[in-house]
């Protein structure tokens, strides 16, 4: 059984037991969180596609950790002007483990 749900403006395909990195969510580590924006639920031959959401669909997950991703380096450069600017960015994420998919 798998589901596609939406969180943080992105869609994620998950199954029970999967670990997924999502955009940062303000929930303490170890707590349970429910995602109700389920777009699709599939169980073998049975596939429920929402229009736009599956009625009564829920994905239940436990927060495993919070952290920051790899650094992305940004460099701005203006030719012939001795101007160079270098910046970095690390995006916050929340790692969750999927415990149940309800349809």
UniProtKB/Swiss-Prot annotation:
This is Large ribosomal subunit protein bL21. GO terms for molecular function: rRNA binding; structural constituent of ribosome. Part of the 50S ribosomal subunit. Contacts protein L20. NCBIfam families: L21. It holds the Pfam family Ribosomal_L21p. This protein binds to 23S rRNA in the presence of protein L20. Transmembrane segments: none annotated. It comes from Shewanella amazonensis (strain ATCC BAA-1098 / SB2B). GO terms for biological process: translation. SUPFAM superfamilies: L21p-like. The keyword Transmembrane helix does not apply. One of its GO terms (cellular component) is ribosome.
